[in-house]
Amino acid sequence: MLPYTVNFKVSARTLTGALNAHNKAAVDWGWQGLIAYGCHSLVVVIDSITAQTLQVLEKHKADVVKVKWARENYHHNIGSPYCLRLASADVNGKIIVWDVAAGVAQCEIQEHAKPIQDVQWLWNQDASRDLLLAIHPPNYIVLWNADTGTKLWKKSYADNILSFSFDPFDPSHLTLLTSEGIVFISDFSPSKPPSGPGKKVYISSPHSSPAHNKLATATGAKKALNKVKILITQEKPSAEFITLNDCLQLAYLPSKRNHMLLLYPREILILDLEVNQTVGVIAIERTGVPFLQVIPCFQRDGLFCLHENGCITLRVRRSYNNIFTTSNEEPDPDPVQELTYDLRSQCDAIRVTKTVRPFSMVCCPVNENAAALVVSDGRVMIWELKSAVCNRNSRNSSSGVSPLYSPVSFCGIPVGVLQNKLPDLSLDNMIGQSAIAGEEHPRGSILREVHLKFLLTGLLSGLPAPQFAIRMCPPLTTKNIKMYQPLLAVGTSNGSVLVYHLTSGLLHKELSIHSCEVKGIEWTSLTSFLSFATSTPNNMGLVRNELQLVDLPTGRSIAFRGERGNDESAIEMIKVSHLKQYLAVVFRDKPLELWDVRTCTLLREMSKNFPTITALEWSPSHNLKSLRKKQLATREAMARQTVVSDTELSIVESSVISLLQEAESKSELSQNISAREHFVFTDIDGQVYHLTVEGNSVKDSARIPPDGSMGSITCIAWKGDTLVLGDMDGNLNFWDLKGRVSRGIPTHRSWVRKIRFAPGKGNQKLIAMYNDGAEVWDTKEVQMVSSLRSGRNVTFRILDVDWCTSDKVILASDDGCIRVLEMSMKSACFRMDEQELTEPVWCPYLLVPRASLALKAFLLHQPWNGQYSLDISHVDYPENEEIKNLLQEQLNSLSNDIKKLLLDPEFTLLQRCLLVSRLYGDESELHFWTVAAHYLHSLSQEKSASTTAPKEAAPRDKLSNPLDICYDVLCENAYFQKFQLERVNLQEVKRSTYDHTRKCTDQLLLLGQTDRAVQLLLETSADNQHYYCDSLKACLVTTVTSSGPSQSTIKLVATNMIANGKLAEGVQLLCLIDKAADACRYLQTYGEWNRAAWLAKVRLNPEECADVLRRWVDHLCSPQVNQKSKALLVLLSLGCFFSVAETLHSMRYFDRAALFVEACLKYGAFEVTEDTEKLITAIYADYARSLKNLGFKQGAVLFASKAGAAGKDLLNELESPKEEPIEE
């Protein structure tokens, strides 16, 4: 290790500040673990774990209104690698699709010039992973290919569209929230636009419903909300309702099919779309803080809610196995009256002011255990959920909230108490399934009650609001290389100075120094600076001047001018001399002051008649070198004096020594030699004065008369033999002091605000700042190098400029950002892999595709050579060292908890696959391995149960640890049936019109609940037009099971009905006579595949149900449907493991196929026959080839050797390296 390492590499970057009102909803948390948000016209990308800025994307010319990460719901391989794709949309209607890692725009899309209302990637990525749907105001939805920028189709609707939501269970369902209501689209397809206008329904706002108001006076708000039965009507409500449509948000619930939430400021309504009615209300008490936003979770039926005070709350659906009533009212006979979401955790609120308020919240889509809050001042706060096992006695049972239990499983597999687990990995590993009504927890199972709490684990602060005064620390030299840090001091309008480290872009120190706006900063060394601030003038035009000297390491600051500063003319500028010895303080209406920086003493206050200064600059020349030479001579003479006899010393020499010894004693190591320095300044008439300062003497040396071609001089810069002056009229005058020539250049850019030379010996570049931008000049050639003009090539106005290094400039701008740019001043995004980060970031997406896939294989196939290791050098991976180092950095950046799991021999292959899919944010694999782990484990339980105990024991375990209901038809039949029964109970309790009652009756008949169906049919009132029909139906239902002939009649009638377009009625009749299998076949014939699957799950025995679902699998795999990933999950739920392996192999998912085969063999899920053997070896051989293509030799050898005869040739090839490189 080197004794010191100094990192002064500074890459181009942008420091961002407060957001714009347009950016309010522009934030997204990607599956890759990165958060992107809009800041004015920029898109900022940060890491959610370390809260570091990784990328700032700049290309939009207007404020960004939406950002969306592409989904990762596809199989990743070399052809479809892990990559960071992001779509951002602005107020001018432009959509840009970015390759975030490279910082380049892949494609730009423009349809109209109005703000994009909403944009989303299609979640079903089997056919294409490049499709993006956008709302172009006022009423168009357009489907784009985001890879090529091609418009696939466009469709307009009658009303203005505000936002939309895709059904997470069915890619053909889309719902639009419009200015008047909701439009349901049921034929969404990438290949053609939706056909009709969609099904339009109106929302009457809960506040405006007259029934609601009436009830509210009678019984309290909670009861009233329970009675809000219908919200969705086909009829347009009367005028006073429409104006009150204050629905903030609409979203499908990913936790259960056909449910949707509507968000209002004071309540969240949960709708069941099968009956179009409210089945749950989350209301805020009168004193509570209104909602701003809600994000529904797919795991555990949870809701993340953001409130107006910046507080984030988590609510989880209550389980009904232990209901207690909290009031004196009589308990309800049927406990499930309402879908209730209990408050389980909340984080701290923020201090809301006029300028600081919460903008938006996003939630981690992979684990759903963390939320990020974006605040208008540019802060991003990352809150993580943590679970703690709590003591039974400590629980407050009077709260009426059922307890939460930790789940039985970890990473998909039930684990023992002593096994390693990481409960905070994800929401479903923190809390178990909410039990369904009447479901008791199994005896003897280890259920530990848990509490959840939010912890602030990341905070990113933005720059405060402009104005800014910026100053870069002194430049890097050979002398200061050991302690140099590239620090930028930023003075702000609230009086504080922020110091940023420009290698990492992170805030190094924040110092509250002044009580008013900082006007200027000058560094006096690498670790100290002077800053000045002036208060607002009083009626005499006088101010309070604050000039502070700040020591950066300690943060200590002293008033540099002591007691001076109250009620005087404002300081205009401060200038520190080249050797940091002297300070010139220039006032508006008061003579110049000269100070000694080292002793903080006033050297000279100029007389009253001293000219008014308009610009001042110190000369880079001084006499320190000649002083140092004299000093060195002294030392040598002194050294000689000790050796040589006195007589040999000349008298002259000894007299010089005595003089210099005096100087030497005053300053150890030449610290306080007062060298002679000089400065120039100009007065109002443009006359140039030249003054010399040495110690405490100030001499006036020369004056140069004004140049007629120049206006009033505003600034001066001096380097080497070049002096440059700028004036009010935009002229630059270049003086060559050696050649004694001057050259004036009119820039035609009005007032020259500031000019400054670049650091570095012989570097004669100069930056000039104007009211409308900046320019870089080469003073040697007297030529402009680059120019930037507000309104022409950038949208922002420049507030201050400086040099960062010899080839990079710093611009502070009125959009609240500070940009470090190349000399060309072109806004450039950077390559993320070139960036210097203070903390390592886990993001395999940043690696080249080959490396990210090799890293995944390395993690999945542990142990290597019988050893669990996270050291990449332990395996044979003949890749270049740079890539290996990058892989090792990724491995090192994993948290200790994750490392512990990966190195645990008890951690099974299935758990490892699930963990790695979470680490990679791979949506497709996460769902595949969740379902695979569940059913492979169930199979092994059944096997062990059948050998040791009576048959009844096996299903018991299935219900105690079921697959989460968000997996819908993939769940076990018994659990799915219970859920559907609970749902129909709820629908029944909530019904309020005949239409709803009829829908409930239909559901009850399909579910085989004939008694309750008959009760509902007999409720039809005599004046209803369906009274006769319903009465007959009730008679039919009660007598239907009696005789054989009646069954054949009913079957005939049912088939006729179906043939004549009455599919639902015919299916119902078939279910009445227990011919549900036929009903399913008819539904499938008529394209109602989802309905058929539902009916099979609730009515058929396992064999018949499997038949129906297998036909569905064939349909899903057909080219016109192309939903093979869904088909795989259905096959897993049926236990058709061999078919899954075959399908994976045919889809060329070799990695997943090989891992799945290994897991199946471990669980004994395959009968090993000749056929299976053939498939297994083919899978292993193909996987070995793909690992060879990744350059992962050891993995390839491992699987080639497992493949037997099929892998023999490959094995030989791998083990005998050829002379010439193999072409891939």
Curated annotation (Swiss-Prot):
Listed GO CC annotations: axoneme; ciliary basal body; cilium; cytoplasm; cytoplasmic vesicle; cytosol; intracellular membrane-bounded organelle; lysosomal membrane
Residues in WD repeats: 59-108, 111-154, 354-393, 471-510, 566-605, 708-745, 747-787, 793-831, 893-940
Subcellular location: Cytoplasm, Cytoskeleton, Cilium basal body; Cytoplasm; Nucleus; Cytoplasm, Cytoskeleton, Cilium axoneme
Coiled coil: none
InterPro entries: WD40/YVTN_repeat-like_dom_sf, WD40_repeat_CS, WD40_repeat_dom_sf, WD40_rpt, WDR11
Keyword Nucleus in record: yes
Subunit structure: Component of the complex WDR11 composed of C17orf75, FAM91A1 and WDR11; FAM91A1 and WDR11 are required for proper location of the complex. Interacts (via the N-terminal and the central portion of the protein) with EMX1. Interacts with GLI3; the interaction associateS EMX1 with GLI3. Interacts with TBC1D23; this interaction may be indirect and recruits TBC1D23 to AP-1-derived vesicles.
Function: Involved in the Hedgehog (Hh) signaling pathway, is essential for normal ciliogenesis. Regulates the proteolytic processing of GLI3 and cooperates with the transcription factor EMX1 in the induction of downstream Hh pathway gene expression and gonadotropin-releasing hormone production. WDR11 complex facilitates the tethering of Adaptor protein-1 complex (AP-1)-derived vesicles. WDR11 complex acts together with TBC1D23 to facilitate the golgin-mediated capture of vesicles generated using AP-1.
Protein name stated in the entry: WD repeat-containing protein 11
Lineage of the organism: Eukaryota, Metazoa, Chordata, Craniata, Vertebrata
Gene name for this UniProt entry: WDR11
